[in-house]
Amino acid sequence: MKRIGAELDIEPVTEPQLEALLPMIAAYQGFYEADDIRAERNREFFRRFLAPSDVGEMIAAWRGGELVGYACMYWHFSSTRAVETVLMNDLYVDEARRGQGIGRALIEACADVARGRGAHHLEWATTPDNKTAQRLYDSTGAERSTWIEYELGL
């Protein structure tokens, strides 16, 4: 567990905590207008990120015993650099708790996990219209990628 200040704890998500996290995962998915949000599917999908995991890790931020945010990382690779990277695929802070440094603390905790794995870098993306997130990301010292992403529906 990583204690940030006197009141914010960030730790890997455990099986019992996953249940408490499901509504927040659904809120994150709703923010990005995901279709067909179902707790059972989310439970099965995100269970694979509980430590120890070969695919990634979920961490959660707690303040006074209350869940206030989470991040989900995927172990990733860069073939152009022949290195391991970490993809922070999800970062979400409860709407009522935004602007309190929780998102920044979660990013820093993800960076710590990535460093601990010997990863070359931590990477993430957001939508072009999520200006609030972009302001946070721009303030972390991270550089905007020059890559353009594509998605092919299957």
Predicted regions and their residues:
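Conserved GNAT acetyl-CoA-binding A-motif
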Residues: 115-126
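A conserved beta-turn-beta hairpin within the catalytic core of GNAT-like acetyltransferases
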Residues: 77-88, 98, 145
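Conserved acetyl-CoA-binding loop-helix of GNAT-fold acetyltransferases
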Residues: 93, 99-112, 139
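A short helix-loop-beta-strand connector motif used in the catalytic cores of GNAT acetyltransferases and
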Residues: 48-60, 87
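Residue-level recognition of the GNAT/N-acetyltransferase active site
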Residues: 89, 94, 127
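A short beta-loop-alpha structural element at the N-terminal edge
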Residues: 9-23
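Conserved beta-strand in the GNAT
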Residues: 60, 66-75
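Conserved GNAT-fold acetyl-CoA-binding loop/helix
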Residues: 26-48
